[in-house]
């Protein structure tokens, strides 16, 4: 938990999921402060759009202006809602939209936290292009090291004249004025053929490894079990290639695709519809924080390629939460399979949570682990 006085109001903010680390990561950064310093409340006219507000620092500060919080992270929405409540601000003060929704017309102010993925930034700038005017104040912010020439060129290409500020507390801002430059259309998804399958994989802008199959998933697919039945989960599904493979290998099983990214879940849905339409009725698609709210003892197996970062920050908090949720939602003798970088040492984490862990396969970079939910000892 951390405190920030941003000039609009004094806030106490925490990350989501919350951690008990001795040196916890902050729920806000200098770029949030720097963005807010640029605004005079008297100049805010028209809708306020906030993009990629990781834990709600901007939304909480500007809540009295009824901002729209736009992004591709359900975790960020949950974190923002929690911080609104914690600071005594009505959740209804902020309207949440995912990045593929229609943005409000003629915004007065647009604040953008520059996302990690340049493709997501381009998708969002193209969406803004449809609604902003020459009078819209457009300001983006990030750590100085995360603003590159390609970032500035993208703003110029999609929206118009762009300048950058001096660094302040290692943060930098981008100021942009909309001038309606000529711009060719771009497809909503990027597609590629998955070798040895005949499948075409479709990827929205914010999907991990959207330009091709990542090597961890490739290794995982080589070792997926067959002859499973009941309900199984592709947890943190991304574009759904693991779930697709499970559907093909296990015709008696139903697959639940889960991710905190609406773009990921929509990509998974599109990939099942396109490649295995006959299996669509065996699928469920869920935008969720891991398996929050899912009843215990529901699933026969969970498959997971857990992230070890949250936006720009390295952390295993999300993976740790995924493992705990998987154990709660597995039936007795249900199995959790994960693929991970070897250096993360998830073997001991799984053994601590499940009481057991086995190595299924390993190579010079990745390891596939299995843990089994055991019954209570008598």
Curated annotation (Swiss-Prot):
Coiled coil: none annotated. Keywords: Cytoplasm, Methyltransferase, rRNA processing, S-adenosyl-L-methionine, Transferase. Gene3D superfamilies: Vaccinia Virus protein VP39. GO terms for molecular function: 23S rRNA (guanine(1835)-N(2))-methyltransferase activity; nucleic acid binding; rRNA (guanine-N2-)-methyltransferase activity. GO terms for cellular component: cytoplasm. GO terms for biological process: rRNA base methylation. It catalyses: guanosine(1835) in 23S rRNA + S-adenosyl-L-methionine = N(2)-methylguanosine(1835) in 23S rRNA + S-adenosyl-L-homocysteine + H(+). The keyword Methyltransferase applies. Specifically methylates the guanine in position 1835 (m2G1835) of 23S rRNA. Belongs to the methyltransferase superfamily. RlmG family. This is Ribosomal RNA large subunit methyltransferase G. The lineage of its organism: Bacteria, Pseudomonadati, Pseudomonadota, Gammaproteobacteria, Enterobacterales.
């Amino acid at each position: 938990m951390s405190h920030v006085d941003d000039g609009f109001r004094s806030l106490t903010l925490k990350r989501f999921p919350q951690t008990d680390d001795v040196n916890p990561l902050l729920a806000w950064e200098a770029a949030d402060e720097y963005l807010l310093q640029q605004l005079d409340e008297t100049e805010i006219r028209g809708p306020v759009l906030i993009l990629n507000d990781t834990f709600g620092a901007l939304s909480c500060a500007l809540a009295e202006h009824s901002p729209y919080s736009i992004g591709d992270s359900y975790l960020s929405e949950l974190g923002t809602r929690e911080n609104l409540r914690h600071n005594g601000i009505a959740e209804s003060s902020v309207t949440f939209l995912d990045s593929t929704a229609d943005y409000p017309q003629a915004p007065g102010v647009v604040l953008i936290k520059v996302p990690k993925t340049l493709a997501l930034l381009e998708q969002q700038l193209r969406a803004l292009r449809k609604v902003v005017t020459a009078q819209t104040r457009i300001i983006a912010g990030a750590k100085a090291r995360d603003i590159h020439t390609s970032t500035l060129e993208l703003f110029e290409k999609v929206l118009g004249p762009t300048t950058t500020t001096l660094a302040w507390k290692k943060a930098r801002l981008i100021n942009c004025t909309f001038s309606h430059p000529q711009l060719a259309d771009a497809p909503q998804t990027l597609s590629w053929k998955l070798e040895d399958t005949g499948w075409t994989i479709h990827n929205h802008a914010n999907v991990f490894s959207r330009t091709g199959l990542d090597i961890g998933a490739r290794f995982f697919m080589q070792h997926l079990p067959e002859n499973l039945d009941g309900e199984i989960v592709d947890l943190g599904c991304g574009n759904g290639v693991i779930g697709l493979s499970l559907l093909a290998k296990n015709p008696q099983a139903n697959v639940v695709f889960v991710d905190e990214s609406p773009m990921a879940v929509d990509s998974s849905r599109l990939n099942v519809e396109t490649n295995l339409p006959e299996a669509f009725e065996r699928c469920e698609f869920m935008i969720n924080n891991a398996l929050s709210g899912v009843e215990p003892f529901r699933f026969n197996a969970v498959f997971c390629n857990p992230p070890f970062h949250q936006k720009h920050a390295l952390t295993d908090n999300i993976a740790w939460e995924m493992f705990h949720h998987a154990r709660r939602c597995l039936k007795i003798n249900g199995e959790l399979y994960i693929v991970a970088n070897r250096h993360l040492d998830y073997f001991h984490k799984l053994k601590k949570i499940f009481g057991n862990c086995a190595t299924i396969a390993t190579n010079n970079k990745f390891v596939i682990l299995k843990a089994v939910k055991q019954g209570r000892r008598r």
